[in-house]
């Protein structure tokens, strides 16, 4: 219900506080050449994931989850044995493991917790109920002050630039880099920029609050080891594709 109410407000509101007018948002989207995708038939995400796992070697797959966990939870619900057989670890961007509560606001809607968790609490609960599944979590605090995207405005024909413009709607293209940092960790190429907590277990309560316990479990938290500036410079360099 919360999910439906949130997206109803997102899609049908005439304007968004701090985001700009809705017509501008849709005008930008319409300029991104989406016509060629309209007649495509897309398979369910669960089917695509299961097929990819079936074709993979045992313990060779890193699953990256930078949004809601519904697709991963769906696979675990119906194909748990396959998931454990093929997956080496799951890297997730979610949660708020600091001692304070961060409050979001959209119109008259308030909620506390982290966005990816709150929008589908049950799926996150399903994922983290798997205490023996290796799961590494980068919470939003790790990327909140790592800003990237400032150089994209000058990059013509850059799909990342188009995505940032559509998302930011007339604002500065600089934005927090939590998702990209999770991707960097998952790729292993940037492993020296991160550190890991001891192993333990992560739980999610019905309000979306995330808690880490160092008791039993195969979960761990990802911390940034490099400083804020190093991350921002690295990510901005990655964005500068050749055109």
Which functions belong to the PLM regions below?
Residues 1-243:
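N-terminal acidic, glycine/proline-rich low-complexity segments
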């Amino acid at each position: 219900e919360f999910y439906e109410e949130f997206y109803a407000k997102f899609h049908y509101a005439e304007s968004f506080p701090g985001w700009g007018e809705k017509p501008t948002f849709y005008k930008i989207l319409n300029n991104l050449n989406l016509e060629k995708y309209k007649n495509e038939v897309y398979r369910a995400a669960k089917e695509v994931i299961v097929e990819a796992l079936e074709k993979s070697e045992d313990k060779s797959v890193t699953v990256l989850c930078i949004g809601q966990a519904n697709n991963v939870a769906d696979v675990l619900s119906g194909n748990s044995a396959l998931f454990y057989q093929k997956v080496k670890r799951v890297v997730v961007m979610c949660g708020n493991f600091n001692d304070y509560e961060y409050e979001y606001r959209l119109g008259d809607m308030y909620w506390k917790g982290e966005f990816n968790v709150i929008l589908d609490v049950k799926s996150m609960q399903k994922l983290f109920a798997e205490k023996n599944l290796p799961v590494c979590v980068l919470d939003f605090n790790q990327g909140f002050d790592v800003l990237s995207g400032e150089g994209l405005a000058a990059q013509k024909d850059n799909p990342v630039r188009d995505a940032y413009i559509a998302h930011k709607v007339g604002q500065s293209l600089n934005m927090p880099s939590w998702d990209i940092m999770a991707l960097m960790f998952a790729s292993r190429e940037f492993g020296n920029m991160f550190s890991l907590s001891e192993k333990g277990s992560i739980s999610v309560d019905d309000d979306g609050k995330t808690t880490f316990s160092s008791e039993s479990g195969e979960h761990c938290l990802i911390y940034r080891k490099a400083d804020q500036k190093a991350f921002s410079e690295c990510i901005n360099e990655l964005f500068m594709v050749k055109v």
